[in-house]
């Protein structure tokens, strides 16, 4: 299916609030919101750490992550600041390690306590969508048979509480659902109208095509030619099997090839290599990365999807150690990148 560039001009654009400034030390939220608005984005993804940090400046102390009264106060104030700048709060993120805990486990009790609290935050922030990332809890701690039921139950709570939606994302370091096929299979089985996919260029290409633990930066479980063919077939399958209405958004970022290959082992916090890569090595497309970002975006567009393109980057520079970022210039660059990406999706080459 050929893409018509004219049909892409109405795609709405969002920028993740956590994605301006060094990942290790982001600047205050309000200047970031202003930079995002000045770059003509129309919405943000509201990141939970930004609620905590803005809450600290608002309240004079950092809110406890489970003090939902204070968190809702901060979220409501963020909504007010977004309203002043004509920014919608498109989604609250990232809700993690929710699904698959055994019955009566402390993990399950914690997950549901957080879920109820985050629903309150959604209401305060004025958003109708919650991003749920596929859990990276170690498999030996999970009951995989509960995954679908847990997400179905959460979807029903979201629907009852406010007509809210659940966008399920494959995190490429997830212990049980690292690929788009995995989350799509789960979403189909959940079978709720308010549950769809959060697809992501990094999570797809970074999981199926790239690998931060190899010298080449690519997966080496097959030969180079077979890798390209396998990835091409995966994207063709994505384009031909996922209904456009089940894609709630596409998140966009590239990745730097890491200076030296990561260990294949999890770090001291339990985070897997691709999770570490994700945290600090994700620039905008056309800015030093090497993933086939446009190939993924093109496949998503071929489903007929024309919804949110949301730029979620964690740009610590090629060495992951960047300390200073001109956030106004960076947001403007992201706006330019959006046009280049759409052009490449249609023509095979980015615009100048």
Give residue spans per PLM region.
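Acidic (Asp/Glu)-rich catalytic clusters
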Residues: 2-10, 31-40, 66-91, 114-126, ...
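Glycine-rich, proline-tolerant flexible connector loops at the mouths of alpha/beta enzymes
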Residues: 45-82, 134-139
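Aromatic/hydrophobic pocket-lining residues that form the small-molecule binding cavity
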Residues: 29, 71, 75, 108-115, ...
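C-terminal helical cap(s) of enzyme catalytic domains, especially alpha/beta-barrels
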Residues: 321-350
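Active-site acidic/histidine proton-transfer and metal-coordination neighborhood
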Residues: 2-3, 81-85, 89-94, 98-199, ...
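Active-site beta-loop-alpha junctions enriched in small/polar residues
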Residues: 16-21, 47-51, 94-97, 135-137, ...
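A short, acidic, flexible beta-alpha connecting loop/helix-capping segment that sits on the rim
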Residues: 20-23, 310-329
């Amino acid at each position: 299916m050929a893409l018509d560039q004219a049909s892409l001009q109405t795609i709405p654009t969002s920028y993740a609030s956590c994605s301006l400034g060094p990942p290790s030390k982001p600047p205050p939220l309000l200047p970031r919101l202003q930079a995002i608005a000045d770059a003509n984005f129309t919405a943000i993804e509201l990141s939970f750490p930004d609620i905590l940090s803005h809450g600290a400046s608002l309240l004079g102390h950092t809110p406890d992550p489970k003090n939902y009264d204070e968190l809702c106060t901060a979220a409501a104030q963020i909504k007010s600041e977004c309203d002043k700048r004509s920014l919608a709060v498109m989604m609250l993120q990232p809700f993690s390690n929710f699904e698959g805990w055994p019955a009566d486990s402390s993990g399950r009790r914690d997950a549901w306590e957080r879920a109820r609290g985050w629903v309150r935050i959604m209401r305060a922030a004025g958003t109708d969508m919650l991003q749920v990332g596929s859990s990276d809890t170690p498999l030996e701690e999970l009951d995989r048979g509960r995954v679908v039921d847990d997400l179905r139950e959460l979807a029903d709570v979201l629907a009852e509480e406010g007509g809210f939606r659940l966008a399920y994302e494959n995190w490429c370091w997830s212990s049980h659902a690292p690929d788009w096929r995995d989350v799509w299979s789960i979403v189909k089985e959940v079978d709720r109208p308010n549950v769809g996919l959060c697809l992501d260029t990094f999570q797809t290409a970074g999981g199926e095509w790239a690998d931060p633990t190899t010298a080449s930066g690519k997966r080496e479980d097959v030969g180079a030619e077979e890798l390209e063919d396998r990835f091409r077939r995966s994207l063709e399958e994505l384009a031909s099997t996922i209904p456009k209405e089940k894609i709630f958004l596409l998140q966009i970022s590239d990745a730097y090839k890491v200076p030296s290959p990561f260990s294949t082992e999890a770090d001291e916090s339990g985070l897997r290599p691709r999770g570490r890569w994700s945290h600090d090595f994700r620039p905008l497309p056309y800015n030093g990365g090497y993933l086939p970002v446009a190939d993924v975006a093109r496949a998503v567009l071929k489903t007929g999807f024309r919804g949110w393109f949301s730029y979620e980057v964690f740009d610590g520079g090629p060495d992951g150690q960047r300390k200073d970022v001109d956030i106004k210039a960076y947001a403007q660059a992201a706006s330019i990148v959006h046009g280049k990406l759409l052009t490449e999706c249609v023509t095979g080459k980015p615009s100048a």
